């Protein structure tokens, strides 16, 4: 997963977002949460997607959430098998490690990133460290971070937390509220359009939109993104909340 697109906003309408995040005990996700999606391209069912909170790991002394995002699908002679993993600090939500394994048609790419928030650097595939940011986010951890935020209708928010500084600021535009029906049921939803200066399913050119449940859980109900081979849409079909209590 990569960036998100927002339309232009007047400077006075854009709110910088504090790096502070809710206490761990109030997070809307927990270990064992698994969200399963139906994957469509141009309204044709082509496969499945999952978002999972796999566990709690220790990364260089930091206690970290380990999350995974997978999309598997096939249409005619084109297949998609993408796998992403993120590890981010349970307290600050700063990304510590990010893994991409992209297999789309004839395109394949695997990358591993290590982030070092304490010295604001990152490295790619074991290469020398490059300048980063102090509270980094990657494409996967960004979605979990957004789930912790209060989102005000009509507002645009800026984040200078993407781990590659040249891709900042990341913007998030709150577009509208609506009631939608997905295979998992009917939900009140809040629709956002994020933007990172990057390529992928959340790039500016993709005009991506994400529907989160308009409640304290902020479940990702639907995601739509324009890709070279058509419009990809994920719709929630099964919810396993893991260790999160009612």
Residue map of PLM features:
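Acidic, serine/threonine-rich low-complexity disordered tracts
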Residues: 12-117, 151-246
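Bacterial N-terminal signal peptides
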Residues: 1-5
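Hydrophobic, well-structured mid-protein blocks that either form specific transmembrane helices
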Residues: 105-150
């Amino acid at each position: 997963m990569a960036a998100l697109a927002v339309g232009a906003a007047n400077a006075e309408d854009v709110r910088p977002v504090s790096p502070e995040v809710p206490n761990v005990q109030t997070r809307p996700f927990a270990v064992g949460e698994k969200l399963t999606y139906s994957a469509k391209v141009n309204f044709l069912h082509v496969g499945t997607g999952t978002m999972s909170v796999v566990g709690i790991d220790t990364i260089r002394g930091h206690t970290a959430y380990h999350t995974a995002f997978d999309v598997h699908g096939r249409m005619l002679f084109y297949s998609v098998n993408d796998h992403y993993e993120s590890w981010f600090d349970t307290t600050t939500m700063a990304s510590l490690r990010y893994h991409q394994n992209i297999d789309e048609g004839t395109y394949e790419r695997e990358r591993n990133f290590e982030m070092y928030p304490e010295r604001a650097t990152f490295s790619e595939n074991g290469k020398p460290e490059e300048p980063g940011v102090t509270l980094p986010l990657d494409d996967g951890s960004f979605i979990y971070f957004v789930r912790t935020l209060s989102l005000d209708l009509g507002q645009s928010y800026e984040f200078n937390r993407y781990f590659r500084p040249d891709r900042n600021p990341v913007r998030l535009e709150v577009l509208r509220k609506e009631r939608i029906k997905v295979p998992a049921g009917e939900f009140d939803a809040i629709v956002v359009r994020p933007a990172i200066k990057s390529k992928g399913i959340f790039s500016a050119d993709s005009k991506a939109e994400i529907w989160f449940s308009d409640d304290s859980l902020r479940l990702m109900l639907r995601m739509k993104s324009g890709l070279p081979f058509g419009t990809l849409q994920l719709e929630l079909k099964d919810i396993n909340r893991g260790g999160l209590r009612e």
